Curated annotation (Swiss-Prot):
Lineage, broadest ranks: Eukaryota, Metazoa, Chordata, Craniata, Vertebrata
Membrane topology: Multi-pass membrane protein
Protein purpose: Core subunit of the mitochondrial membrane respiratory chain NADH dehydrogenase (Complex I) which catalyzes electron transfer from NADH through the respiratory chain, using ubiquinone as an electron acceptor. Essential for the catalytic activity and assembly of complex I.
Catalytic activity: a ubiquinone + NADH + 5 H(+)(in) = a ubiquinol + NAD(+) + 4 H(+)(out)
Gene source species: Phoca vitulina (Harbor seal)
Name under which the protein is recorded: NADH-ubiquinone oxidoreductase chain 4
Primary localisation category: mitochondrion
Membrane-spanning residues: 22-42, 60-80, 98-118, 147-167, 194-214, 224-244, 256-276, 284-303, 308-330, 350-370, 391-411
Family: Belongs to the complex I subunit 4 family.
Length: 459
């Protein structure tokens, strides 16, 4: 594990010691190297886990998320170069340091062996994210967004700490590997219901569940590009990861308690997809589509069958790469037209034909077209929910249709139509941006050749 953690820590002195013209090249190259090293964790044997030390372990659930986290840092650095070009040197270095610190916390969160350590690191990821949003966001509303983000996630996760201390008292350990062997069945009673809610609420807010999702569109819209990317791609997955880990402790009770939350996520999935159809703001549309995809994941995790777990893991990885790519595309539009309003930046296909190709591919990935892993994840989830209850097929079908509608709506509004007068003389697409899109799409297409490495612990 140290072969990833120590190089990530060493990226910080590298950032501060690099020459001004070498900062981006150095950090991007070295972080890409770290992400290539982390791919070795994906090659794991069956359902056993690698206990790397007393503090860290990886298994087939945390390894794909670990690889996703490390893969994202070089992409964030590549995406941020343009909008930081006018910033003073110290501020650039501080920004990169924040991103590296966030990656460090995320890696340790996904591989922590012990639940209290997991909780501390889970909370620690808030700090760099908050600084990135409130310091480098575009509009003045970023402070409001930061407050929303902080309070929603903190209020949601404070009961979790109390619940964890209570479990520690009862069981004597919070080690993930021990818990699987020692977990006592949890009968339904008032106190256990509260315990269940305390354990799950933190992750439900983080996912976010429909109704607790108000912080997400705000945070996404106000964050700079790297903030949006890491928020959509990795921070939402912390919720899913935590839920999958902690359901071991709450085994029989979840069967009774999950119903209202499943209904809420099924309903929310359709609601947020419908909200996407009437968005005028491009980033806001992508943020709401994230909520709708994560509702599928919540649904899958609460069904608690091997198939649904596999679907949830695959969907988390697929969504991480897809939404990150969509945010990059939205940002490349924003850098040229200086507006996120879709009406003002239409007809770009004539001016940026290669970008239009990337937009098409990203939209098709978002609506789960066959060769991508988005389809594999969604198929698993749809089948699992159908075998749980036949009626869900109506809701799932509706959701899939609306998803296709808003993806194509997003594509046609930004690419088709007559372009507006003020964007005649925009810059062409850079090699940097094309490389960025390629690095997002490559894993999505390659993983469809061998999806079993991201299907989680059951496969």
């Amino acid at each position: 594990m140290l072969k990833i953690i120590i190089p990530t820590m060493m990226l910080m002195p590298l950032t501060w010691m690099s020459k001004p013209n070498m900062i981006w090249i150095n950090t991007t190259a070295y972080s890409l190297l770290i992400s290539l090293i982390s791919l070795s964790f994906l090659n794991q044997l069956g359902d056993n886990c690698m206990s790397l030390s007393l503090l860290f372990f990886t298994d087939s659930l945390s390894a794909p998320l670990l690889a996703l986290t490390t893969w994202l840092l070089p992409l964030m650095l590549m995406a941020s170069q343009f909008h930081l070009s006018k910033e003073p040197l110290t501020r650039k270095k501080l920004y990169i340091t924040m991103l590296i610190l966030l990656q460090l916390f995320l890696i340790m969160t996904f591989t922590a062996t012990e639940l209290i350590m997991f909780y501390i690191l889970f909370e620690a990821t808030l700090v760099p994210t908050l600084i990135i949003i409130t310091r480098w966001g575009n509009q003045t509303e970023r402070l409001n967004a930061g407050t929303y983000f902080l309070f929603y996630t903190l209020v949601g996760s404070l009961p979790l700490l109390v619940a964890l201390l209570f479990i520690q008292n009862n069981m004597g350990t919070l080690n993930f590997l021990m818990i699987q062997l020692w977990a006592q069945p949890l009968p339904s009673s008032w106190s256990n219901t509260l315990l269940w809610l305390a354990c799950m609420m933190a992750f439900m807010v983080k996912m976010p569940l429909y109704g607790l999702h108000l912080w997400l569109p705000k945070a996404h819209v106000e964050a700079p590009i790297a903030g949006s990317m890491v928020l959509a791609a990795v921070l939402l997955k912390l919720g899913g990861y935590g839920m999958m880990r902690i359901t071991v402790l709450l085994s029989p009770l979840t069967n009774f308690m999950a119903y209202p939350f499943m209904m809420l996520s099924l309903w929310g999935m359709i609601m947020t997809s419908s909200i996407c159809l009437r968005q005028t703001d491009l980033k806001s549309l992508i943020a709401y589509s994230s909520v709708s995809h994560m509702a599928l994941v919540i649904m899958a995790i609460l069904i608690q069958t091997p198939w649904s777990y596999m679907g949830a893991t695959a969907l988390m990885i697929a969504h991480g790469l897809t939404s990150s790519m969509l945010f990059c595309l939205a940002n490349s539009n924003y850098e040229r037209t200086h507006s996120r309003t879709m009406i003002l930046a239409r007809g770009l296909q004539v001016l940026l034909p290669l970008m239009a190709a990337w937009w098409l591919l990203a939209s098709l990935t978002n609506l789960a077209l066959p060769p991508t892993i988005n389809l594999i994840g969604e198929l698993f989830v749809v089948m699992a929910s159908f075998s749980w209850s036949n009626i869900t097929i109506i809701l799932m079908g509706t959701n899939i249709i609306i998803t296709a509608l808003y993806s194509l709506y997003m594509l046609t509004t930004t690419q088709r139509g007559k372009y507006t007068y003020h964007i005649k003389n925009i810059k062409p697409s850079f090699t940097r941006e094309n490389a960025l899109m390629t690095l997002h799409l490559m894993p999505l297409l390659l993983l469809s050749l061998n999806p079993k490495i991201i299907l989680g612990p059951i496969y």
